[in-house]
Amino acid sequence: MDKIRIGIVGYGNIGKGVEKAIARNEDMELTAVFTRRDPASVKIATETAVVKTMEDMKSMKGEIDVMVLCGGSATDLPVMGPQIAADFNTIDSFDTHARIPEYFENVDKAAKAGGNVGIISVGWDPGMFSLNRLYAESILVQGSTYTFWGKASARDTLMRSAGSRE
């Protein structure tokens, strides 16, 4: 069986977590990590994968089956999502709820033009938490749905605030 060849775009906490998840799945292999940093400064755990600049991405076309986009929803994904979906199958965790329809339209248009598939907003919320709410609401149709998400509660928003640090 051929393994699914994965590329990771962005190697922060999410990218590192994706690398660990890939290592635990026998049907996948990490092929490359793409970064805006100097590739020599990025140390990954997967010895068989390479680290490349974002500019080198297109040279890997045909060698990667799926790109996992690990950028932030505020500024990274709105730009990189459609750009990368034009050349690769992509999956991301875009989570700016109010902008999902616009983001979907942009990624879908680019992916279709390139003969690719772009799967968006597959994270905690939207994503796993959304599915949990859907299941609960289908059973408890008269119930009330509450979330702990609200204005400025997203980590991305908090980390961009003055005085925030890891």
Where on the chain are the PLM-derived regions?
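Rossmann-fold NAD(P) dinucleotide-binding segment
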Residues: 57-66, 74-93
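Glycine-rich Rossmann-fold phosphate-binding loop(s) that bind the pyrophosphate
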Residues: 11
